[in-house]
A protein has these predicted regions:
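Active-site-facing substrate-recognition patch
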Residues: 1-29, 65
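PRPP-dependent phosphoribosyltransferase catalytic core
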Residues: 2-5, 26, 107-172
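Short, highly selective alpha-helical patches that border small-molecule cofactor pockets
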Residues: 16, 40-44, 48, 102
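Short, well-ordered alpha-helices that flank and scaffold nucleotide-derived cofactor binding pockets
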Residues: 21, 45, 49, 107-111
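Short glycine-rich phosphate-binding loop at a beta-alpha junction
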Residues: 28-37
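A structural signal for isolated positions on well-ordered beta-strands in alpha/beta enzyme cores
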Residues: 32, 56, 90, 129-132
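Short, glycine/charge-rich flexible loops or terminal/linker lids adjacent to PRPP-binding catalytic cores
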Residues: 49-90, 97-108, 119-122
């Protein structure tokens, strides 16, 4: 039987404070924050409100949406520094589960803006960083999350995490 862990709204606020503190400890500040729909939007907005940094949304739904993910070329150009200096971007999701979402972003952004340029190797974990409330150590995301609050290892323990925005009734 799968073990379930329920996060409270207080847990989420505490984790967002932790991410902000980790950024300040690193002396790193994003120019903007990208919240991934659906799970990353809420923590990204909370972090945005705590820091006064603007927040954007990016739809990367690899399993729940027939339309699939959207590509935001302007974010890739900002990350790369296509027309100016590279922009610091914090990409936020609730969980790095399999790693597919973050890997898709890296592949999509690089393929949309000078894909063969070696400069991309210095983009990731420098001016573009990933943050999650929970990081699955068994994920296939090889770059690692710069900022995280809880670590799990789903290859050792099968756990289902329930965030407060997922624990509401369905209407209609």
């Amino acid at each position: 039987m799968i073990k379930k862990h329920y996060y409270s709204w207080q847990d989420i606020e505490t984790m967002c404070i932790s991410i902000v503190n980790q950024m300040y400890t690193d002396n790193w500040r994003p120019d903007y924050i990208v919240g991934l729909t659906r799970g990353g939007n809420i923590p990204a907005t909370i972090i945005s409100n705590m820091t006064g940094i603007r927040c954007e949304a990016l739809k990367v739904s690899l399993r729940d949406d027939e339309m699939g993910p959207e590509s935001n070329c302007w974010m890739a150009e900002d990350a790369f520094g296509y027309n100016k200096e590279p922009t610091n971007i914090l990409i936020v999701d609730d969980i790095n589960d399999t790693g597919a979402t973050f890997n898709w972003i890296m592949k999509d952004w690089q393929s949309s803006c000078l894909p063969d340029d070696d400069k991309w190797q210095s983009v990731w974990n420098n001016n573009v960083r990933f943050a999650t409330l929970t990081d699955n150590l068994a994920s296939e995301f090889t770059e690692h999350c710069a900022y995280t609050c809880h670590e799990i290892n789903k290859s050792e323990e099968d756990v289902w995490l329930v965030y407060p925005w997922e624990n509401v009734g369905q209407y209609g």
